[in-house]
UniProtKB/Swiss-Prot annotation:
Cellular localization per UniProt: Nucleus
Protein's job: Component of the Mediator complex, a coactivator involved in the regulated transcription of nearly all RNA polymerase II-dependent genes. Mediator functions as a bridge to convey information from gene-specific regulatory proteins to the basal RNA polymerase II transcription machinery. Mediator is recruited to promoters by direct interactions with regulatory proteins and serves as a scaffold for the assembly of a functional preinitiation complex with RNA polymerase II and the general transcription factors.
Cellular component terms per the entry's GO annotation: core mediator complex
Main location (coarse class): nucleus
Single GO MF annotation: transcription coregulator activity
Protein name according to UniProt: Mediator of RNA polymerase II transcription subunit 15
Length: 762
């Protein structure tokens, strides 16, 4: 399969930058680097899309963990750390485990069809793994809207939570009956012990079941409490989105009372349903259903407010699913307005297709978003999932999909940006309409109500009022918000107009800033980094920054670049010309561009000029080329002959010649790279040349200097004697060259020249 390079596109990278900036704003962390620099570092470090998304998830986890410790210390007072060891290893402080989260990301990126498998190995703490991997998986899905689960045999599409075609949440791909193995079911069925069993059969095929034994809802052992508390603490730590900590903090001495709210006057009907719910859970476990069931009553489910509530039912006729927008059961208190997020295959929990907590009677049901019999194909509660739907799938996947009991496992479907506020009135819109059928047309339809209304429920007094409804998962809103606060209203029109005018005024600095960065390429690195940061702010209008920051940018740019006037109208032309001149074809481009304009202005070049007078041509090296002896011109015949001479002969006028005569004296040199250098010869051209042959004379002092030159002189004299009566300058110079060649031969005197040999140049 071809490698997916969509993560390298500018639009995809910009969405990642927006999410990083959003996480920084929500946590209130101050960083020396902005989102663009962080994303650029991650982009160059990653080799493929999975690594890229994994690094981004780790980065955002790190940003959120920076403030998680301080917030958790304030909320819990340090009393919850002793309850964190229940998941087979304990999370200590409930902090997310980024290593498991990133391993989970890698497996999710390569096998989206197996994202619903819930194989948790022994020793995996429910709180730490669920919190860290939940955030990371939510981040991954928010970055990958295209992985928003495919079809499930009909209209059940928009809410598939990492499910393969086999409609399983815990097994490999295949039918729902593949959930087999020695660990199936609630092992031992021990009272009060957290069991995570995978049923070998049933129509829901191996979903996680987390049941509480018949010890009573207020007597959960520390293991269960630690795991639930770890979930809640992780939720509290995510950007200040505090939810699910019903009644404030949870202590070992009051483990279940504050969570359920029983110590604060919980209605007896919900309390009575809690124990019945536990019995029902054990029945479901023995049947191998394996659905996600937290051992809490419906009232507790409502108070958990979109925590890890995967309520499912058997789907019998007694399961009267109620299509209520707020999800209130008939016997539940006002604290049950928000339904648990049902995490079934495709959002359909159990064969009945509803997404609530379904007990054996109608009074034990928390309202789900849809009703119908088996195979109804309805959408479950699509609570803020959109592109952020996730299913925890740790890397310790057991063969056959078995989950070891006691290790802890959780399904988490609420992203940090999509926490639901508890609503006191049904008039506040639900995340989805009641009984929504068919896949949602757009994730934007699933934005929960932005109403920030405090709940009148006394049991929710400990829940911090900063839990908010985040932005749409796929949205790239860039409005700055305070950490953990509600989405602020947009700026008033006056401030918006001031911001736009100031930004437009600063755009004139973009080009000078680019040129300055190019000039300072090898200079001060810190200064270049500041300049690049300013350029990023000016070049990215989608990122909103405070108006004070714009004023600071303007002051810095003014100090660096000075006051820049408005761009002149001809500036683009000048820049285009300067860039064209730097190219190799600059002159050609200029001529092709401006010649028609110049011809139109000044007319074409003057044509049909009179032919210039024929000038005398003589290949002479000095200024006396056209100077004839006695003031006359050099004959044209002689000029033509000199012009046609071989390039190895260099001819010039003799400057020492006596003026007043009509004869022409020339000095000739032989310049051949294959012959030795010899002194020049003096040639006298008579007045009636070519009727009279020229004469040649050698400078005796020079040609008598060495035996070689003496041999050249003798050979030349012998050859001249063999020349015919009328010969030309060309004949004379060729004879001179042959004399030099003969002197250079090993046996220069063996062959005497003859008239024929001399004429033939031999």
């Amino acid at each position: 399969m071809a490698e997916d390079n969509s993560w390298k596109t500018s639009n995809f990278r910009q969405s990642v930058v927006n999410k990083i900036n959003e996480a920084i704003q929500q946590t209130g962390m101050t960083s020396s680097k902005n989102g663009i620099e962080m994303e650029n570092h991650v982009f160059h470090k990653a080799r493929n899309k999975d690594e890229y998304l994994g690094f981004v998830a780790r980065l955002i986890l790190h940003v959120r963990e920076m403030t998680a410790a301080a917030q958790q210390a304030q909320q819990d007072g340090g009393g919850n750390s002793s309850q964190q060891g229940g998941g087979g290893g304990g999370g200590g402080s409930g902090m997310p485990d980024p290593i498991n989260a990133l391993q989970n990301l890698a497996s999710q990126g390569t096998r989206p069809q197996m994202m619903g498998q819930m194989g948790v190995g022994p020793g995996g703490p429910m709180g730490g793994q669920m919190g860290g991997a939940g955030q990371a998986s939510n981040l991954l899905h928010s970055l990958r809207p295209q992985m928003q689960m495919g079809g499930m045999g009909g209209p059940m599409q928009g809410n598939r939570v990492g499910m393969g075609p086999g409609n399983q949440m815990g097994g490999m791909m295949g039918g729902p009956n593949q959930m087999q193995g020695p660990g199936a079911g609630m092992v031992g069925g021990m009272p009060g012990q957290m069991g995570v069993g995978m049923g070998p059969g049933g129509m829901s095929g191996g979903k996680i079941q987390m049941g509480v034994g018949p010890g009573g809802p207020n007597q959960m052992n520390p293991m269960v409490m630690g795991q639930i508390q770890a979930q809640l603490q992780n939720q509290n730590a995510m950007g200040g989105q505090q939810m699910g900590t019903v009644g404030g903090t949870m202590n070992a001495g009051n483990q279940m009372g504050q969570m359920v709210g029983a110590n604060a006057g919980m209605n007896p009907q919900a309390m009575g349903m809690a124990s019945n719910q536990v019995v029902r859970q054990q029945q479901l476990q023995q049947q191998g259903m394996g659905q996600v069931q937290m051992g809490l009553g419906p009232g507790q489910m409502g108070q958990l407010s979109a925590g890890v509530q995967g309520g499912v039912g058997h789907g019998g006729p007694a399961m009267q699913q109620q299509q209520q927008a707020g999800g209130m059961g008939p016997g539940a208190g006002p604290n049950q307005m928000n339904p648990g997020v049902a995490m079934g295959p495709g959002g359909v929990v159990g064969p009945a297709g509803g997404g609530g907590v379904m007990g054996p009677g109608p009074n034990q049901m928390l309202g789900a978003g849809g009703a119908g019999g088996p195979g109804a194909g309805q959408q479950g509660n699509f609570v803020g999932m959109g592109a952020n739907a996730m299913v925890r799938k740790p890397p310790e996947m057991m063969p056959g999909g078995n989950v070891y009991p006691g290790s802890g496992g959780a399904v988490r479907s609420v992203t940090p940006n999509n926490f639901l506020r508890q609503s006191p009135s049904p008039s506040v819109p639900s995340p989805v309409g009641p009984g929504a059928h068919g896949p949602p047309s757009h994730p934007g339809q699933m934005i929960p109500s932005p109403a920030l209304i405090p709940s009148p429920n006394p049991h929710m007094g400990g829940v911090a009022q900063r839990s908010t409804i985040g932005q749409s998962p796929g949205g790239s809103l860039n409005t700055p918000g305070q950490p953990g606060g509600a989405v602020p209203s947009p700026l008033n029109p006056q401030d918006e107009q001031l911001y736009r005018e100031k930004y437009r005024a600063l755009t004139k600095y973009i080009e000078p800033l680019k040129r300055m960065i190019a000039k300072m390429e090898n200079d001060d690195i810190d200064k270049i980094a500041k300049m690049k940061r300013l350029l990023e702010i000016l070049s990215n209008p989608s990122v909103r920054i405070p108006l004070e920051t714009l004023h600071k940018c303007e002051a810095a740019l003014t100090s660096q670049l000075g006051s820049i006037r408005e761009t002149p109208t001809n500036n683009p032309l000048v820049e285009a010309v300067s860039s064209s001149l730097q190219a190799a074809t600059g002159n050609h481009t200029l001529q092709r561009t401006f010649r028609p304009c110049l011809e139109a202005l000044f007319g074409p070049d003057i044509k049909n000029l009179p032919p210039p007078a024929k000038q005398s041509r003589l290949a002479l090296d000095d200024t006396g080329a056209a100077v004839g002896t006695g003031g006359g011109e050099i004959p044209h015949i002689l000029q033509g002959e000199i012009a046609r001479l071989d390039q190895k002969f260099k001819v010039s006028l003799d400057q020492c010649a006596i003026s007043g005569t009509r004869t022409i004296k020339l000095i000739c040199w032989l310049d051949d790279k294959n012959l030795p250098c010899v002194p020049p010869v003096a040639v006298t051209i008579p007045e009636d040349y070519p009727s009279t042959a020229p004469s040649c004379s050698l400078i005796e002092q020079e040609y008598n200097a060495t035996p070689f030159l003496i041999l050249v002189q003798k050979s030349l004299m012998a050859r001249i004697c063999k020349l015919p009566g009328l010969f030309t300058l060309s004949h004379l110079l060729d004879t001179w060259e042959m004399s030099v060649r003969q002197a250079c031969s090993p046996n220069p005197t063996i062959v005497a020249p003859t008239g024929t040999s001399v004429l033939l140049g031999m």
